[in-house]
Design a protein with these regions (language model features):
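A short helix-turn-beta junction within AAA+ P-loop NTPase domains corresponding to the substrate/partner-engaging
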Residues: 97-119
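AAA+ ATPase active-site-proximal loops
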Residues: 1-93, 114-127
Length: 128
């Protein structure tokens, strides 16, 4: 499914899990991959990547989030598969208006949330 449909994937978890998962996903794709730096703008129109790896999306500035939403909404732009990563859960940021809900749902067609039990916000709440 990941090869034919190429859904956007949001990977949440510790650095080792994220790196391993991204490596596995990249290995499954036969085309070129672009690794963007943190808080990077969307690629220019001449990028021929089949996959974009967008790290640490939880740290995208509000302006950068708007740029990504505009880019993803532009029907005239070819959109590669996006693998976005975060070491912290992004949905709480959406609920507190610190992260665009539109962007969140565009980036996580598939959500791989692999926080350990010790990292989970629910567990931390119970321990208080």
């Amino acid at each position: 499914m990941l090869r034919s449909v190429r859904p956007n994937i949001l990977v949440i978890g510790g650095a080792d899990f994220v790196a391993s998962t991204v490596s596995t996903l990249v290995a499954m794709l036969p085309g070129p991959v672009s690794y963007l730096p943190p808080n990077a703008p969307p690629p220019a129109g001449d990028d021929d990547a089949e996959m974009l790896v967008v790290p640490d999306i939880s740290s995208l500035s509000q302006n950068r989030q708007r740029e990504w939403v505009r880019w993803l909404s532009d029907a005239d732009v070819r959109h590669p598969q996006i693998v976005a990563t975060s070491e912290v859960p992004v949905y709480p940021l959406v609920k507190s208006d610190q992260f665009s809900g539109v962007l969140y749902y565009r980036l996580n067609t598939i959500l791989l949330d692999m926080q350990t039990a010790d990292e989970s916000p629910a567990r931390k709440s119970r321990e208080r």
